[in-house]
Amino acid sequence: MISEEELSALMMAIKNRYGLDFTNYEKGSLKRGIVRLMSKHHMESLIELWGRVLKDHDFFANAIDDLLVNLTELFRNPDVWIKLRDDILLQYGTVNNLNIWHAGCSTGEEVYTMAIVLEEKGLLYRTNVLATDLSSRALAKARGGNYPRQLMNQYLTPLIKYFPFSRMEDYFDFEKSHATVKSRYKDHVRFERHNLVTDPMHERFEIILCRNVMIYFDEKLKSKVLDLLFQALRPGGYLIIGYYDIMPDYGKTLFKVKDLQTRIYQKPLDS
């Protein structure tokens, strides 16, 4: 069992060594991530993990994926994408440049979902899409756009709920063991490493998706990240959070509810 003191000491050592601040992440989630990491590498003590994390940069870069479990899939929560298609994106039908940020994009399934929706609305070629994540390994997979073929049947169910007559072959090139996102989608996404907790964001966006990311944060860290997202949104822009995310009271002072069911919030025009 990992004690609070051991966890705090390890997180502080990581912060001092790599500049990554996990001190306000949800403690139970971090402890479970550490247990997964130790089991995966057959480590018997936290001291053994501590030494490896602080001495081996490549090991730590890969360990981030075990510390932070990514929740993502193609067309996850179809009603969100239907709301985007039938309401939110209609407001940008005549704009020349639509800017969208996927904050915490994980392995890219949600990014490519948005690209498919944008194409359907005739907006893909007028949209600048930025997708960021803390994990370099997740970003590499997202850039490649390669997913195990067996996942396609799983992803087909929510896709059909969104668009009943869709075929995966319209969006992916299939090979024996995997499917690859068609280049017309990959070419319109810029993937970058970004830490929501410590890194600034100088660009401005009409839509930001930060879904199932804040579940790992305590209230203090949620407020800090929401400040960043608020500043990055243009007035009248939309923030979309995940079904497992809970908007804290502080966030409710920044954003107004657009659609509670789909967790869509709006930055007031006068902000």
PLM regions with names:
Residues 207, 248-271:
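Core SAM-dependent methyltransferase catalytic element
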Residues 1-101:
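Conserved AdoMet
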Residues 107-122:
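Conserved SAM-binding loop of SAM-dependent methyltransferases across substrates and taxa
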Residues 96-108, 127-130:
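Conserved class I S-adenosyl-L-methionine
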Residues 127-209, 213, 221, 246-247:
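Extended basic-aromatic, gly/pro-enriched interface segments that bind polyanionic ligands
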Residues 223-235:
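A short glycine-rich, Lys/Arg-flanked "PGG" loop and its adjoining helix->strand segment in the class I
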Residues 235-243:
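Conserved beta-strand signature within the Rossmann-like core of class I S-adenosyl-L-methionine
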